[in-house]
């Protein structure tokens, strides 16, 4: 099983991009009122949630391999990443309720989607510091 964990660095970029694309698409809907972008957002968050599950599984496998040293940074990355994956699943599930027009449903979906994007950004940053070090951006 540890072999599949080695795919985490490859797979992790897909759900990040999909969640960010979903959030960007929904922002376009809010700003321009063009509902076609909502379809883009929903497709991306659903795909991002599915890929997030696969990526989280490979991340857990990778973290338990002898290649990775346990650290507080790893634990933060692990749990913020899990929260992001769970939030993505929540946003994807909430997107199915949007076929019935409701301002409340739209607000809850969008709030969950934007929180998901924030969690994914934080988890991605933490993962980057695990790979490149905390001083990567320092001159």
Where are these regions (language model features)?
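Polytopic transmembrane helical bundles with strong interfacial aromatic enrichment
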Residues: 1-139
């Amino acid at each position: 099983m540890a072999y599949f964990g080695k795919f985490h660095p490859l797979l992790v970029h897909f759900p990040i991009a999909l969640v960010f694309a979903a959030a960007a698409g929904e922002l376009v809907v809010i700003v321009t009122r063009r509902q076609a972008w909502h379809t883009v957002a929903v497709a991306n968050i659903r795909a991002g949630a599915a890929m997030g599950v696969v990526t989280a599984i490979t991340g857990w496998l990778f973290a338990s391999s002898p290649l990775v040293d346990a650290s507080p940074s790893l634990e933060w990355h692990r749990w913020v990443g899990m929260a992001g994956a769970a939030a993505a699943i929540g946003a994807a599930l909430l997107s199915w309720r949007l076929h019935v027009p409701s301002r409340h449903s739209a607000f809850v979906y969008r709030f969950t989607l934007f929180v998901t994007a924030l969690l994914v950004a934080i988890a991605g940053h933490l993962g980057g510091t695990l790979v490149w070090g905390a001083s990567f951006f320092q001159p």
